[in-house]
């Protein structure tokens, strides 16, 4: 066993987050037991509509005190649009985590798994395997801007992109380091400097400057419009793709869609220096339309758990989970309905746990 247990803050959140979270924990516990990793799960009920309904806010005032000393945050999903506006639930929880815990890296794998039908022609497992690195705390999603003269002919709105040298350089450093660690050693930058004439040329300048520190990494850049086309036409070209907050947001959803489904995609909102806990969550969201039916696919939650273990330094345990996911997806009867199987959420989660080696 590790010297002391990793303390994980568990926040199921809304909708199917509450259903897939137990399966994620089940698989982590299976991997932890086999690989001598000690894990302690602490459960929290905030960052959910249920909490908002009772307290009028998404999280308690002392939320940072409650979870700030944990090693990581394992997050299910947030949002219930029929009951609470998305901007209220998101900005009242996940955005706070990202900004106040300085989770400046959003990291998502794009990988075609066995048993998952690919919408792209003539693609098989192994053909699509890359990472999208998204700047997560500034860029186009700043709060700088405003609205004036509402409901008049003079009405206008503005929202400014914010790029700082510190912010741009640190995300590029993370991306180049990741590319350097991979066999292909190839980085692609998303830009639009032919149309966005101030911030994007600056981004390009910083990419070129950072590249000089990594002579062993090949790099290129594409404008975001053609880059999205190449994700579909030539996904095998890519290894590590880095983009600003907006461009990274677009690409990190498009990439998993090219592998057949975003329903199994994981993600990490990461503070690489570990000054604060990082958040690991599935991409799929709260899915109110299927919540409560026990049919949600738990793979995204489970895969996010593997990313969390790798972030904590438990690479062998993490790899054992990813391998178990691959073996489970290869068996049609063990897949959930969205992937053509007939397993429910619990059965799929148990299958992955049993296949952990």
Features from the language model and the residues they span:
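Buried hydrophobic packing segments
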Residues: 24, 28, 207, 301-309, ...
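Short acidic loop-to-helix transition motifs that present clustered carboxylates
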Residues: 115, 222-229
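Glycine-rich phosphate/diphosphate-binding loop of Rossmann-like nucleotide-binding domains
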Residues: 9-26, 31-32, 152-224, 237
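Buried hydrophobic positions in well-ordered alpha/beta secondary-structure cores of metabolic enzymes
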Residues: 14-17, 71, 133, 175, ...
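Glycine-rich phosphate/pyrophosphate-binding loop and the adjoining helix
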Residues: 137, 143-189, 193-196, 315, ...
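N-terminal beta-loop-helix "entrance" segment that forms/cooperates
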Residues: 36-60, 231
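N-terminal glycine-rich phosphate/adenylate-binding segment common to multiple enzyme folds
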Residues: 51-158, 246
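Glycine-rich phosphate/nucleotide-binding loop
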Residues: 52, 230-333
């Amino acid at each position: 066993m590790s010297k002391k247990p990793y303390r994980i803050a568990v926040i199921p959140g809304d909708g199917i987050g509450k259903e897939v979270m137990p399966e994620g924990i089940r698989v982590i516990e299976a991997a932890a037991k086999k690989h001598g990793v000690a894990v302690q799960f602490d459960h929290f009920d905030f960052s959910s509509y249920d909490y908002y309904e009772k307290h009028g806010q998404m999280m308690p005032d002392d939320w940072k005190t409650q979870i700030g000393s944990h090693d990581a945050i394992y997050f299910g999903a947030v949002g219930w649009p029929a009951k609470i506006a998305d901007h209220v639930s998101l900005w009242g929880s996940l955005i706070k985590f990202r900004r106040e815990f300085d989770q400046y890296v959003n990291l998502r794998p794009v990988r075609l798994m066995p048993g998952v039908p690919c919408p792209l022609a003539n693609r098989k497992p192994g053909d699509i395997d890359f990472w999208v690195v998204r700047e997560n705390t500034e860029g186009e999603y700043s709060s700088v801007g405003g609205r004036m003269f509402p409901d008049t002919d003079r009405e206008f709105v503005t929202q400014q992109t914010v790029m700082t040298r510190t912010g741009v350089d640190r995300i590029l450093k993370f991306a180049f380091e990741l590319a350097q660690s991979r066999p292909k050693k190839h980085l692609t930058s998303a830009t639009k400097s032919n149309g966005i004439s101030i911030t994007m040329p600056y981004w390009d300048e910083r990419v070129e400057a950072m590249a000089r520190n990594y002579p062993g990494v090949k790099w290129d850049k594409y404008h975001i419009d053609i880059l999205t086309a190449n994700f579909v036409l030539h996904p095998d070209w890519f290894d590590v793709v880095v983009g600003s907050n907006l461009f990274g947001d677009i690409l990190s959803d498009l990439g998993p869609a090219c592998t057949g489904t975003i329903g199994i995609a994981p993600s990490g909102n990461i503070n690489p220096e570990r000054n604060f806990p990082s958040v690991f969550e599935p991409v799929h969201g709260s899915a109110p339309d299927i919540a409560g039916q026990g049919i949600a696919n738990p793979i995204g939650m489970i895969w996010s758990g593997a990313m969390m273990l790798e972030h904590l330094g438990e690479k062998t345990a993490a790899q054992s989970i990813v391998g178990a996911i691959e073996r489970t997806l290869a068996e049609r009867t063990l897949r959930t309905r969205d992937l053509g199987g007939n397993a429910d959420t619990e059965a799929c989660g148990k299958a992955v746990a049993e296949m952990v080696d």
